[in-house]
Regions:
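Short amphipathic
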Residues: 162-170
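Charge-rich, well-structured scaffold segments of protease-associated domains
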Residues: 2-152, 168, 175, 184, ...
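Short proline/glycine- and acidic-rich turn/helix-capping motifs at secondary-structure junctions
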Residues: 154-163
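A domain-level signal for the structural core that forms small-molecule/cofactor-binding pockets
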Residues: 180
Length: 261
């Protein structure tokens, strides 16, 4: 049966998510941990797709895509990435489009599973009162012994130019929503990546945090509300700093951010 249903019947709380860089399957439980871990590892290791299951999931995902496309905060975020990046996969919607998922077949999914669902491309993370040696033994027992080739990824060439300076989209909202983004040179792996992340987070707090002079000035003038904030994201091959929220005068707020920076 469905692995997530089996995990639920076994007392676990399973779920899954896909981001721009990762697909993850996980569960929480207070008992039967080893058994649940074996179920999860078997689930991701042994693919099984039929035309019926693909058609069913296509309908569900299509509904989710339509719902997300009607969400203002998601639209402003995806528009930001499309404006910032020329070729990075980050500019492509994670769930795809209704048209693109219509082309998916069981063969497509088997090919993707073979390419990406390989132990060489996986990470297993366990948090709790467990013994690492026992976890490693379970993983070695369940996961395939053979290791595929390390996948060479091509995220395209990105320079510091943006695709579009500004994009507007009309939607039914009580107050305009906006985001402004700044492309940053991506750091290398390891310590450089962590250092960039820490420095950028500190910079965001100093410049955009709710105790910053900029935030207080804009708030006192009624130009922003509690939704205003900023952050820093790193994805494979790219990095960017962003700020935004709700405002009746987004252009004024953006100019103030640029002046402060």
């Amino acid at each position: 049966g469905n692995a997530l249903q089996v995990l639920s019947q076994n007392g676990a709380e399973p779920n899954a998510f896909t981001s721009n860089a990762t697909t993850a399957y996980y569960f929480d439980c207070t008992e039967h941990f080893e058994e649940n871990l074996k179920i999860l590892l078997s689930f991701v290791s042994v693919p099984y797709f039929t035309q019926e299951s693909v058609d069913k999931e296509r309908g569900i995902i299509g509904q989710e895509i339509r719902m997300v496309e009607d969400t203002p905060d998601w639209r402003v975020y995806t528009n930001l990435l499309e404006c910032l990046y020329h070729s990075s996969p980050a500019r492509v919607a994670i769930a795809g489009t209704v048209e693109s998922i219509a082309e998916i077949t069981p063969e497509t999914l088997y090919a993707c599973h073979k390419a990406f669902y390989d132990p060489a491309n996986m990470m297993l993370c366990v948090v709790g009162d467990v013994k690492p040696d026992e976890i490693a033994a379970i993983a070695e027992e369940i996961l395939p012994e053979s290791r595929g080739e390390v996948i060479e990824r091509d995220y395209g060439q990105e320079d510091m130019r943006v695709v579009e300076k500004c994009r507007r989209e009309a939607m039914e909202v009580s107050m305009p929503q906006f985001l402004v983004g700044f492309k940053c040179p991506p750091a290398a792996d390891g310590a450089a990546l962590m250092r960039q992340d820490i420095i950028a987070d500190i910079a965001c707090d100093i410049l955009l945090g709710d105790s910053s002079p900029l935030y207080q000035r804009l708030y006192d003038k009624g130009l922003i509300n509690g939704s205003f904030g900023g952050g820093f994201d790193q994805l494979p091959g790219i990095a960017y700093l962003y700020a935004g929220g709700d405002s009746n005068e987004p252009e004024t707020v953006v100019r103030a951010i640029l002046d402060e920076a």
